[in-house]
Amino acid sequence: MSSQNNNSLFTPVLIAGSLILLIGFAIRSTFGLFQIPIAEDFLWARSEFSLAIAIQNLAWGIGTPIFSAFAEKYGDRKAITLGLILYALGIFISSTATSPESHQFLNILIGFGIAGSGFGPVLAVVGRATSDSNRSLALGITTAAGSAGQVIGPPFAAILLSIMPWSSVFEIFAIISIITIILVPILKTNPNRNIQKSEENLSDALKQAIQDPTYIMLFLGFFSCGFQLAFITAHFPAFIAEASSPIIQGSLISIVCNSVASLGALSIALIGLF
């Protein structure tokens, strides 16, 4: 019986990890939808909040190795919990922010929150909790769950933005993020499992990686892919909203959405789907 549990694919750890990534990246993919509402509310240029999104992405990248080191020293669950707290705190305080500088600063907090509750720590737990035969598939499923968040998040945010102000939507997202912490206790691996520990330090690992052409190509691939996806999710919804004519009731497009804002959200969801 124990052997069957160890060899099963859809473990509680896999499901909990997938849900954490799905929720986290669903929220992250919606920030582009807030450009126009925030700009119109404060009479700013859209570039002010788009800069905040750019800072968020930089903070996510910078925070990833920091949280990986934190998880290695203090435990993955503590790292993920801290990430979710920072994520929720940054979004919640952003709902009350009234200056471009405050939004830009708070997106540093949000970016670090994404780093702490994102792919790095979660995939590490899922990988260790899964049998060798199922590990690749389990990691693929968990990663796909994070990508699925982009399909779910923007349409959900567009619905909320159509019935309430952007600040209230931020508050809802903050509450959802903090509630996600209830999934963290499920992320535990088998303490009796024999895991080989490497004596290699960080500098040796980096030196070896830099000398590996495969790593360089993988790094460049992620860099280009991440750049274009971040650019599209940040600017595409606002671009569609500003460039499109009002949607005419009874037209073909009105079957799937009733405003240009929801059309932008649907576009991001379709990009995430394919």
Regions found by a protein language model. Give the residues of each.
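Cytoplasmic helix-loop-helix junction between adjacent transmembrane helices
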Residues: N107-A144
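Conserved MFS/SLC helix-loop-helix module at the cytosolic interface between two early adjacent transmembrane helices
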Residues: I62-P100
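Flexible cytoplasmic inter-helical loops of multi-pass small-molecule transporters
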Residues: K188-D204
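Residue-level signature of mid-helix packing/kink "hotspots" within the transmembrane helices
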Residues: S29, N57-P65, Q150-V151, N258-L266
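Helix-loop-helix hairpin linking two adjacent transmembrane segments in secondary transporters
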Residues: T142-T189
